[in-house]
Amino acid sequence: MADFFVGICRVLSALSNKLRLYNQTMQILEPYIPKEYLALKINYLRQKLAAMPEVTKTKRVIRGKKLDVYIVNSRIYYSDSKTGKELQLEYIKRDQLKCELLKLESTWNCYFRGMVPKDIGPRKITRRLYRSVDDAVILNSDFFECLKNDADPNYRESKILFYNGTYYRSAAEVEIARFYTENGIPFKYEPEIWLNGLKYPVYSDFVILIKELDLCKFHEHFGMKNSANYNRITATKYNNYSGAGLLPELDVFYTYDVDGVPFDLRTLSTKLNSVIYDSLFIP
């Protein structure tokens, strides 16, 4: 019995040491702010706001009743009218975008100062994935919406970590999902993807949508294992994506795990910034 309790204490001590190491690591890490991606998001919101009508709001008393009044192009619309209700939604949406833009501009001023470069602007970029020699699909928001989240039927018992409605296979995947969620980047986890040359689907770790470019990116997260078999699987994934017309570090980017070391999200942030910035120069 004494040996049993000694064993339990050793396990708890080991877990405590790992937790302390993790906390110390997290305290050391400073957030990496992706400069080009931040500029793209700011210019995207500025463009959206510029395209929206300038709606102002005030109040008036009509027959003893206070009503919200919306003014656009010097014309007045009451909130109980059809147009007034539409303008109310437009006013709320515009206000939300302005608040989001203010936060991003504050981050820019805090870390970079100066003018936001205007050449890093939103636009539609066309990239294609080949599902067969004669079947190509554009990697845009329509493609993204057709993907099913968490579609991989294999080894579901290994998904034991829960975050935001989905079970993940590793702590690093949870951190990646949290990163995308908190940064407002839509993503699908392990969606089913058909690639040219394959008779079976693959399940990418993450497919993300860059709304500002209407463009999808594939993100594979690998464990760094000293295993020849694992390395062969990794090499096969590289080749499968290339055979479907996807370029490494442009259409597909990769991150890696190191045993015993918490995944550093600065790595993901740097990679993401790089593939987005490179995409801006695609003709």
Regions found by a protein language model. Give the residues of each.
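Nuclease-adjacent, charged terminal/linker segments that flank catalytic cores
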Residues: 1-142
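Solvent-exposed, charged helical/coil patches
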Residues: 118-186
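Short beta-strand-loop-alpha-helix junction that forms the active-site gateway
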Residues: 160, 203, 207-237
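Active-site metal-binding core of divalent-cation-utilizing nuclease and nuclease-like domains
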Residues: 166-168, 181, 186-212
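Short, well-structured alpha-helical interface segments that form or flank functional binding sites
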Residues: 171-175, 198-201, 236
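Acidic-and-aromatic substrate-binding clefts and catalytic sites of carbohydrate-active enzymes
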Residues: 193-201, 227-228, 258-263
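Basic, glycine-rich
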Residues: 243-283
